Amino acid sequence: MSKIRGLPPEVREPGPGVELGVENGLLCQLIHSPEFNLFSNSVVFESNFIQTHVPEADFQVTKPGNWRDVCEGSATVILGVTSSVPSLPLPNVLLMANVTWPQGPFTTWSTPGDAPVINLSRLLPLKYVELRIYDRLQRILRVRTVTEKIYYLKLHEKHPEIVFQFWVRLVKILQKGLSITTKDPRIKFTHCLVPKMPTNSTETTPENSLLSSPQPSEPLVLLAAEQTSGSFSQLSGKPQLTADRNNDTAIEIDNCSSYKIPSPVASPINLNIPMRAALSHSLWEQEDWNEHLLQVHIASYLGEHFLGA
């Protein structure tokens, strides 16, 4: 029984990233392999580093320029970043792997015994990692995790200087942001690492109406408060009583009939809570304007009856 084989993979010329050793490297092949199958549609930016240490010290560095390799022999550390979703404009995942090269770094192998051994040691969200440039001259990065674990990683000497400049640019991008556009516009998504600036749009949708609904301004709120306080001040004076009890009753009925409860719909205050308030405050912290106005009108109506009695 013959097996149907698929088409051979497309042969492409290696890009400049592959030649520099920052794309399609061992870390990318590891997480895209069937064993892990992680972020298969995302690009991985990676480089080889040497973890540094200072002799006769508990810390990895004490004085500038006094470094020692932590890993013995030809062991190296691969540091890389990628995106959990290909459409994200910035990477959001940090990867670290320990590599042992039997024949030395960047060497080719023809037999499985000469292949490098790679173990994925860290897979962390970038928002829980602090990445800094510690020493530009010696090309050293400082990586601090949320558990206060600090790594001092020196870029391998096999990498040219341009590779470290890529890491310098990456650190600046992660700190300040780069773009609000996506990598692939065909992929639809509802979240973005970089906040999108508001744009003037004439189209109104249910979501846009919530986002564009203005928040009640302070002058309008003060005006409503003055009108409410004025109605309370009018209720403080009792109607003059006459000798005839029937006339008193008629006066009170006329006062009640002349007072009308304003409709909340006719109020100039916009009662829609904007989406910004919903994002910055929890539901129980938001003030319900409908309930507030209704309580004021009921209190005014009851106060008029009690004060006029």
Swiss-Prot record:
Pfam families reported for this sequence: GARIL_Rab2_bd (PF12480)
Keywords from the named record: Golgi apparatus, Phosphoprotein
Domain of life: Eukaryota
Listed InterPro entries: GARIL-like_Rab2B-bd
The keyword Ligase appears for this protein: no
UniProt modified residues of type Phosphoserine: 231, 263, 267
A GO CC term assigned to this protein in UniProt: Golgi apparatus
Compartments where found: Golgi apparatus
Example GO BP: acrosome assembly
General function of this protein: RAB2B effector protein required for accurate acrosome formation and normal male fertility.
Matches recorded under PANTHER family: GOLGI-ASSOCIATED RAB2 INTERACTOR PROTEIN 1A (PTHR22574:SF10), PTHR22574
Quaternary structure annotation from Swiss-Prot or TrEMBL: Interacts (via N-terminus) with RAB2B (in GTP-bound form).
Family, similarity comment: Belongs to the GARIN family.
Protein name: Golgi-associated RAB2 interactor protein 1A
Native source species: Homo sapiens
